[in-house]
Swiss-Prot record:
InterPro entries, per the entry: Pyridox_Oxase, Pyridox_Oxase_CS, Pyridox_Oxase_N, Pyridoxamine_oxidase_dimer_C, Split_barrel_FMN-bd
Name of the protein: Pyridoxine/pyridoxamine 5'-phosphate oxidase
SUPFAM superfamilies, per the entry: FMN-binding split barrel
EC number: 1.4.3.5
GO molecular function: FMN binding; pyridoxamine phosphate oxidase activity
Family: Belongs to the pyridoxamine 5'-phosphate oxidase family.
Reactions mediated catalytically: pyridoxamine 5'-phosphate + O2 + H2O = pyridoxal 5'-phosphate + H2O2 + NH4(+); pyridoxine 5'-phosphate + O2 = pyridoxal 5'-phosphate + H2O2
Residue positions binding FMN: 61-66, 76-77, 82-83, 105, 140-141, 185, 195
Enzyme kind, highest EC tier: oxidoreductase
Amino acid sequence: MTDLSDIRREYTKGGLRRADLPQNPMQLFELWMTQARDAELSDPTAMCVATVDEHGQPYQRIVLLKRFDDTGFVFFTNLGSRKAQQIATNNKVSLHFPWHPIERQVSILGEAQPLSTAEVLKYFMTRPKDSQIAAWVSQQSSKLSARQVLEGKFFEMKAKFAKGDVPLPSFWGGYLVKPSSIEFWQGGEHRLHDRFLYTRQADEWVIDRLAP
């Protein structure tokens, strides 16, 4: 067994105080996302999306956040993917943003709701053409005999869609994750980290400080 117990560091970038918190967690998330981008973090919109299968087995993968507002968090995916199939069975999901360089994390619990075709198409048309073509090529989460099969299909579809717009695949869509709770974690000195949990109750958010 590899011993990693000596790998540690101190957290020195400051704390998070109750008096500084807005009542709406999306305002704090927007501020933290802006600061993560300004800090030029690698992939600040990358989030871990956790789902659960019918046997209770959890799965995780990294997905890019594409939009957020007071209603929730939006991402897009192949509707035949493992995550989409699991969401169809159990739409309770968890999102996690690990912004280690600025000593912050955000953890979100909520329910994923499918976006309308109009909303999906609006985003799909903003993607680079090669990305649109790639959406047609990959049967996400299915087994492949070799990478060459995938590449061959890509160039085949690229020739097919050489002229004009690439149509939206019927098996490609997106989700709005409506949060029921959002936790903000700020690293603190002596491992006394600051954690604040926003919990949705009716039409308001209740804020609690959690022990680190």
